[in-house]
């Protein structure tokens, strides 16, 4: 069950698979230093909390928090129970006190980690596939199965803006530029819609259409803007590839090939120099952004690897 004690190796990469295991790896060496089974869970998303050593798994239908530095890291230290269907998105405010989640039950929920309870709830008409927090820390942006993108104002407790790029085409993934100036939405037709985000301190955020990018000919399962000054957009697709787009003109910079099945998830390193991906071919892979080449293959899962997250220290 455990391949090593978690104390002697910091967490660099976490992956979850349909084989009902969560694995933790050293990103540089490719060594899986421990794993644990979760036979009663279906994990859709993994996130490391702002508090070091803790991992959150968005499951069906609950959210579970694991303390990776405890003597029993496989036993959840907290269970967040309120959603009634698959939890598809989870994330945190930078202070670490507030957690947000989005679910196929059509809700976006706000949790206070100090009291373990759902504090607020926003309702969407259809299943929620993706939720991101704007860098201003006061707005959540959600995308749903009917193609709606909604901005939820946490100060006013209301939907302040709604965008519908393609009626009826599911929004699969959302990403926001680190400085809040750009928002990208990816859908099931392989299209990315890009807006310039106009932020005013005293008013709500406004969105100005900037670009429409036909990135793939099939589902985009994850889109992600790079951190810092690296101006790239990564799109992971059911066509087995990950494409890297230069934001200056939205030109195709690189195509990362090597996965043999759908690529479900991706995550940039903190400096934007590397990208990790998760695929139905059971592997996770590490890529160099400069070379556009595969640096490492993480292979131990027996079924599809559906989500991955890199430690941001």
Swiss-Prot record:
Q: What are the alphabetically sorted keywords of the record?
A: Repeat, WD repeat
Which GO biological process entries does UniProt record here? Answer: TOR signaling
Q: May I have one GO cellular component term?
A: TORC1 complex
Q: Output the SUPFAM superfamilies linked to this UniProt entry.
A: WD40 repeat-like
Highest rank taxon of the organism: Eukaryota
Instruction: List, alphabetically, the InterPro entries matched.
Output: G-protein_beta_WD-40_rep (IPR020472), MLST8 (IPR037588), WD40/YVTN_repeat-like_dom_sf (IPR015943), WD40_repeat_CS (IPR019775), WD40_repeat_dom_sf (IPR036322), WD40_rpt (IPR001680)
WD repeat residues: 1-35, 38-76, 82-121, 123-162, 166-205, 215-255, 258-297
Question: Carries keyword DNA repair?
Answer: no
- Gene deleted: what happens? No visible phenotype under normal growth conditions.
Q: What does this protein do?
A: Probable non-functional protein.
Please state which protein family the record places this protein in.
Belongs to the WD repeat LST8 family.
The miscellaneous remark of the record is: The existence of a second LST8 copy gene is specific to Arabidopsis and could be the result of a recent duplication. The expression of this duplicated gene (At2g22040) could not be detected experimentally. Could be a non-functional gene.
Name used for this protein in its record: Non-functional target of rapamycin complex subunit LST8-2
List the source organism: Arabidopsis thaliana
Gene transcribed to yield this protein: LST8-2
């Amino acid at each position: 069950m455990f391949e090593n004690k978690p104390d002697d190796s910091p967490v660099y990469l976490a992956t979850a698979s349909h084989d009902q295991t969560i694995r933790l790896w050293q990103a540089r060496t490719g060594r899986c230093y421990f794993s644990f089974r979760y036979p009663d869970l279906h994990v859709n998303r993994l996130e490391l909390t702002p508090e070091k050593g803790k991992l959150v798994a968005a499951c069906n239908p609950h959210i579970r928090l694991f303390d990776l530095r405890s003597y029993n890291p496989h036993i959840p230290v907290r269970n967040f129970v309120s959603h009634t269907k698959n939890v598809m998105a989870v994330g945190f405010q930078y202070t670490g006190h507030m957690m947000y989640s989005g679910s196929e039950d059509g809700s976006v929920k706000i949790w206070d980690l100090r009291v373990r309870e759902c504090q607020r709830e926003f309702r969407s008409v259809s299943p929620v596939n993706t939720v991101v927090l704007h860098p201003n820390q006061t707005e959540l942006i959600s995308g749903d199965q009917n193609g709606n993108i909604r901005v939820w104002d946490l100060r006013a407790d209301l939907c302040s803006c709604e965008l519908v790029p393609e009626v009826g085409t599911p929004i699969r993934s959302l990403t926001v530029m680190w400085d809040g100036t750009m928002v990208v939405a990816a859908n099931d037709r392989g299209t990315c819609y890009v807006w310039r985000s106009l932020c005013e301190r005293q008013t709500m955020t406004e969105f100005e259409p900037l670009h429409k990018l036909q990135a793939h000919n099939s589902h985009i399962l994850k889109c992600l803007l790079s951190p810092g000054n690296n101006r790239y957009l990564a799109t992971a697709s059911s066509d087995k590839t990950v494409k890297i787009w230069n934001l200056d003109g939205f030109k195709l910079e690189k195509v990362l090939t090597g996965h043999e099945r759908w690529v479900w998830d991706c995550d940039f390193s903190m400096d934007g120099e590397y990208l990790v991906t998760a695929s139905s071919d059971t592997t996770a892979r590490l890529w160099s952004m400069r070379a556009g080449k595969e640096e490492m293959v993480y292979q131990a899962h027996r079924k599809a690897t559906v989500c991955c997250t890199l430690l941001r220290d």
